[in-house]
Every structure is written in structure tokens, then in C-alpha cells.
From Swiss-Prot:
Homodimer. SUPFAM superfamilies: Aminoacid dehydrogenase-like, N-terminal domain (SSF53223), NAD(P)-binding Rossmann-fold domains (SSF51735). This is Bifunctional protein FolD. Pfam families: THF_DHG_CYH, THF_DHG_CYH_C.
Amino acid sequence: MEENIINGKVIAEDITSTLAVCINDLKVQHNVTPCLIVILVGDDPASHLYVRNKQRKAEMLGLRSETMLLPSTTSESSLIDTIRRLNNDDSVHGILVQLPVPKHIDKNLIINTIDPRKDVDGFHNENVGRLFTGQKKDCLIPCTPRGCLYLIKTVTRNLSGSDAVVIGRSNIVGKPMACLLLGENCTVTTVHSATRNLPDYCSKADVLVAAVGIPHFVKSSWIKPGAIVIDVGINAIEEGGVKKFVGDVDFSEARNIASAITPVPGGVGPMTIAFLMVNTVIAACNQAGIENFVEKYLDL
């Protein structure tokens, strides 16, 4: 059933190739070159890999991008000073602090030090508040949930009246994902570690989004036949002495039940980076007073 697999890698490449044209036109027509600064504190190997991927994609698209590597001993006050300097630099349009940060640094304080107009992760309280109060056009939306919704809408444009279940309640994925689905007029249920009879909720979902970080947590028996299944999880496991990455959904069985399903890897992951680039260009346009420029190129 290859035809029911949602190829996030191909879809993300379509988005970024269109975005590259948008960026070039933005430069030519408005003399604006979007600029993204990524701040990485410490030496976490996974974080360094993520940041390299973001940097590579930004450069491919014609964005101006820079990674600031700071030692793990960087003080909270020093990091705040760095962010404030970038906030005041009109040539910088997007600021991203790669998470996690060292334990001596208050993550929420750092996120909310970023100018909300430059908060391309969409985590600042102001952006969160606007999203939750239905002001989607006036905020930067978290990249992973935005990418998930885009994938869902490649399967069906009309979600109105659909029953949607989001497994997970994180601020990064679960909560904003539920909010975006509400905005599409879905009836949304959020389930989590304390939910009783969790499979019963899942089995009623027309749209099921799994974001719990537990390998193969969602069984095929939980899935409603014909459901759209979006697997946000990316979990490292060892199988026969070989390290591999799997999702939160038991993909091998679930693919036979779902009408459409994302694989891991190659599903949601590429969309997260694609929408980070989209958010950076939107932020640049907003700061330059250019309205609805990206929307001329991408159906957002």
C-alpha cells in the first residue's frame, strides 16, 4: 500500500523549491534578504546535527544564515544580552535558540526574550496567545504542527466536522496541533499519559496525530479504518545490533489500516525544517511591512 504513504520528504522539497523562488523575488522586488540566526549553547551531538541541517537548507534557499556556537558554561544573562542585541539588529529577521539549553538556563525566560516578530519557532507567549485566540494570521506558528497540518491537507482539504485525536500535550507539538485542528473545525480530543482507555479515543479518530516519544506506542488495533495518521515521533532503537529510527506508531501494521500515514523517517521531520524556512521568510516580510507575499507562492 505504498500509495497511502505520505512522503514528507518530497512534499517538503516541493515547498522549499517554491520558497526559493519566493526568496529570490523578495530580494529583487523589495531588496530584502531574509536572515536567520541560530544560537546553539553547549555540545549536544543531536542539537549540532539539527542545526547543521537547518544551516544547509537555509543556504540552499538563498537565506542569509548564521549559527552562533556558545559554550555550555554561557551564563543566562550573557545569552539574554546576545538575544537582545539580535532583537535590535534590523538585518536579522529570525532568531532561534536550539533546545534543549543547559540546565542552569531558564528555557522559558530565553524564549520570551526573543522579539516575538523574530520568534521563528513560534514559542514566545505572544505568538502562542495569538494562535490560541484564533489570530493565526498575526503570529508565527510552531513549525512541526504547521507541517503536520500541511501534510494532512495534502490528503483532504476539508477537515470540517472530522474527529481528530492528538496524543501528547507538549507546548511544542501537542497543544498547538490541537489548536490548529480546531481552527479547521475539527472536533479535537487531546489524550496523554493520564488518559484512561486511551485506545478507545484513538479508535474514533478520523485524524490521529501521535507525539509522545515512545517507539511503536500506537498499535494498529487503535486505528480507525481509513484514518489519516501523522507520526511525529522519532525514536532511536536497536534492532539486531543496528541502530534505527522509528516513530510512535507501529507503522508496519498501521499502514494496512490507515488511508494515509507518514513514515519515520521521511514524514514529519523534513516538514519541520521546511516550515522553519517559511517562518523566516514570513518574519522578514512582516518586519519590512510587506503583506501576504509568501502566500502568493504557497497555499498556507
